[in-house]
Amino acid sequence: ECIGHRRSCKEDRNGCCKLYTCNCWYPTPDDQWCKCLL
């Protein structure tokens, strides 16, 4: 499992999530967080 700050799920394709399912939630209007799960 990998958790990281991302501006969007699409951008995270270049990060740790690229082989996993990316679930995003929005702690603030200006930020998104991705949690990558197997």
UniProtKB/Swiss-Prot annotation:
<dbReference type="GO" id="GO:0005576">
    <property type="term" value="C:extracellular region"/>
</dbReference>
<feature type="disulfide bond">
    <location>
        <begin position="16"/>
        <end position="36"/>
    </location>
</feature>
<comment type="similarity">
    <text>Belongs to the neurotoxin 02 (plectoxin) family. 09 subfamily.</text>
</comment>
<keyword id="KW-0960">Knottin</keyword>
<protein>
    <recommendedName>
        <fullName>U9-ctenitoxin-Pk1a</fullName>
    </recommendedName>
</protein>
<feature type="disulfide bond">
    <location>
        <begin position="9"/>
        <end position="22"/>
    </location>
</feature>
<feature type="disulfide bond">
    <location>
        <begin position="24"/>
        <end position="34"/>
    </location>
</feature>
<keyword id="KW-0964">Secreted</keyword>
<keyword id="KW-1015">Disulfide bond</keyword>
<feature type="disulfide bond">
    <location>
        <begin position="2"/>
        <end position="17"/>
    </location>
</feature>
